[in-house]
C-alpha cells in the first residue's frame, strides 16, 4: 500500500483528495486480513497507524537521521537493479542527481549497518505500507509534482526497487488521488523502457483507489502506469450553515431588518454592532465593503445567505465504508437536491418538488437568497425553525430542514411531486448509495485476485450523475453512450451536407 505525501512534509502525510487515507489504509488491511491475506500486527486505528509512520523515517529530511525503523535497500542491491535500466536513462538521473551515495536519503556503511537507502516503509506480515518518495530534494514540490521533465532521484527508484525485488510484491495499491508516479517523464501513451513510469514500476499489477469525480487524472494513471481504478465516493456533503461570529452576525442582521422603519434608535445601535463585528472577523475585506453603510449591509446579508446554504464537505470518505447517520442523510439529500435525467417525476429536484407542492411559487435552486420573502408561510415549514423568516434564504433553509425530516421519516411529503422523489430515493438512490462501501472493498479484492473489475462512468454524483453509483468499479472518462452530443451531431450533419 503506497500513501501519497504532497508536499513532502510530515503535516501532509497520507493525503488523498476527499479520502481519509489513514483510516482507509487500516480498513483495507482489515479487509485483507478477513480475506486470509497474511496481515500481522494490524494497527488498532488510524491514529495508531500514523503514530507508527511518524516514528519512522519520512520524506521530511530535518530529523530523519534520528528516527528508527523503516526498511533498508543495501547499496549493492540497488546498484544491481539500477544497472538494468537503459544507459540513457541512467545518464539523465546522474546528470541531475549525481551518484547514488550522494543522495541525502542514503546512509553510509557503519560498524553496525550496511550502507543503503533508508525507506519509509512499514511491514505488516505480507502487507507493506510505504510513503511515496518525493520527486526530488532541495526543490519546490508544488512546482515539480507534475513536472514533465524532472527525473526522480535515486531514493525514489530505491523505494520501488525494494517493492518489486526485495519484498517481491505481487501487486501495488496506490491509495487515493493522487501520487506522482504517473506524472514522471516519458511518453503519454505506449510507454517504452526509457519512460520513467515503465522503468520504475515495470509489469507490476497496479490497483488505484481513486475519487469518482476526477476521470482526467485517473485516466493518466491508467495510460501511464497500467492502473486498474477502483473508484470511491466523494466526501459526504452538508449545508454550511452559520456558527460562532457568523451566527451572531446573522441574528443581528435579522434584528436590524425587523427594526427598519420602526425603531430608528435601535437601527443605529445595531448598525454599529454589525459593522464592528464584521470588521473584527475580517469579513468586511472578504465581502468588499465600500464604506457605504446601506450597501455594505445588503452585501453582508447576501453573503451570509449564500454562505449558509452552501454545500460543503462533512469530513472525508473512508474507502470501503458507506457514510452512516447524519452524514448518510445529508449526502442522500445532496444527491436528490438537483434534478437528474429529464428532471421529471422521481428525477426532479427534491427541493423544487417540495416548493411546488407547497405552492411557494419560487425556484429554491435559482433565486437570490437575500431577497425579501413575499410568498406564503405554510405551517409545515414555519414549525421547523424559530429563526426569523425574512428572505428567500430563510425559505430554502426550511425546505432543507423539511427534507431532513422526510429522510428521517418524521414528516410526510407535502404533495404528489415530492412523494415521487421520495419514492425514487427509497427505491433507488438510498439502496445504491448503501452498496458503495461494500462494493469498493469488493472491487479492491477482486483486482488483487487478478479478476475482472466492472467498468463504470465517472463524474460527480452530487451534480446529477447518479449513474456513476455504486462506486467500487473501474471508471472510464468518455461515455460512448453520450457521444456525439446533440450539438456536435447537428454541426456534423451540416458539415456533411455542405461537403456533399
Segment roles from a protein language model:
Residues 2-500:
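Ligand/cofactor-recognition surfaces for anionic moieties
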Amino acid at each position: 500500500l503506497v500513501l501519497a505525501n504532497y508536499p513532502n512534509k510530515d503535516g501532509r502525510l497520507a493525503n488523498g483528495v476527499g479520502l481519509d487515507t489513514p483510516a482507509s489504509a487500516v480498513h483495507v488491511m482489515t479487509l485483507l486480513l478477513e480475506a486470509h491475506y497474511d496481515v500481522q500486527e494490524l494497527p488498532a486505528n488510524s491514529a495508531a497507524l500514523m503514530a507508527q509512520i511518524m516514528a519512522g523515517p519520512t520524506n521530511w529530511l530535518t530529523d530523519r537521521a534520528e528516527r528508527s525503523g523503516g526498511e533498508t535497500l543495501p547499496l549493492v542491491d540497488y546498484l544491481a537493479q539500477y544497472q538494468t535500466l537503459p544507459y540513457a536513462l541512467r545518464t539523465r538521473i546522474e546528470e541531475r542527481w549525481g551518484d547514488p551515495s550522494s543522495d541525502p536519503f542514503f546512509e553510509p556503511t557503519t560498524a553496525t549497518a550496511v550502507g543503503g537507502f533508508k525507506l519509509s516503509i512499514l511491514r505488516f506480515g505480507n502487507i507493506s505500507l510505504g510513503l511515496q518518495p518525493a520527486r526530488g530534494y532541495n526543490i519546490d514540490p508544488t512546482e515539480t509534482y507534475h513536472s514533465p521533465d524532472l527525473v526522480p532521484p535515486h531514493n525514489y527508484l530505491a523505494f520501488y526497487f525494494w517493492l518489486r525485488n526485495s519484498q517481491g510484491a505481487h501487486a501495488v495499491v496506490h491509495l487515493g488521488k493522487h501520487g506522482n508516479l504517473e506524472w514522471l517523464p516519458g511518453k503519454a501513451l505506449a510507454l517504452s523502457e526509457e519512460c520513467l513510469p515503465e522503468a520504475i514500476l515495470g509489469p507490476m499489477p497496479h490497483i488505484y483507489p481513486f475519487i469518482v469525480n476526477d476521470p482526467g487524472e485517473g485516466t493518466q494513471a491508467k495510460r501511464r502506469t497500467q492502473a486498474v481504478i477502483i473508484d470511491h465516493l466523494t466526501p459526504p456533503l452538508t449545508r454550511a450553515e452559520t456558527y460562532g461570529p457568523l451566527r451572531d452576525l446573522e441574528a443581528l442582521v435579522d434584528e436590524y431588518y425587523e427594526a427598519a422603519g420602526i425603531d430608528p434608535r435601535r437601527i443605529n445601535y445595531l448598525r454599529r454592532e454589525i459593522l464592528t463585528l464584521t470588521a473584527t472577523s475580517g469579513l468586511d475585506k472578504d465581502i468588499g465593503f465600500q464604506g457605504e453603510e446601506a450597501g455594505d449591509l445588503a452585501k453582508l446579508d447576501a453573503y451570509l445567505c449564500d454562505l449558509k446554504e452552501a454545500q460543503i464537505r462533512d469530513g472525508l470518505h473512508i474507502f470501503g465504508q458507506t457514510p452512516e447517520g447524519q452524514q448518510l442523510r445529508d449526502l442522500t439529500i445532496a444527491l436528490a437536491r438537483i434534478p437528474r435525467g429529464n428532471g421529471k417525476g422521481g428525477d426532479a429536484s427534491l427541493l423544487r418538488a417540495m416548493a411546488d407542492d407547497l405552492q411557494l411559487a419560487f425556484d429554491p435552486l435559482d433565486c437570490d437568497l437575500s431577497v425579501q420573502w413575499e410568498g406564503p408561510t405554510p405551517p409545515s415549514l414555519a414549525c421547523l425553525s424559530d429563526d426569523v423568516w425574512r428572505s428567500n434564504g430563510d425559505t430554502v433553509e426550511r425546505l432543507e430542514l423539511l427534507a431532513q425530516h422526510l429522510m428521517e421519516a418524521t414528516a410526510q411529503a407535502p404533495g404528489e411531486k415530492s412523494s415521487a422523489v421520495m419514492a425514487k430515493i427509497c427505491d433507488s438512490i438510498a439502496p445504491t448509495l448503501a452498496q458503495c462501501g461494500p462494493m469498493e472493498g469488493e472491487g479492491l479484492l477482486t483486482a488483487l485476485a487478478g479478476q475482472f473489475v466492472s467498468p463504470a462512468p465517472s463524474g460527480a454524483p452530487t451534480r446529477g450523475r447518479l449513474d456513476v453509483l455504486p462506486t467500487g468499479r473501474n471508471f472510464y472518462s468518455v461515455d460512448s453512450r453520450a457521444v456525439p452530443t446533440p450539438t456536435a451531431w447537428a454541426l456534423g450533419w451540416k458539415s456533411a451536407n455542405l461537403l456533399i
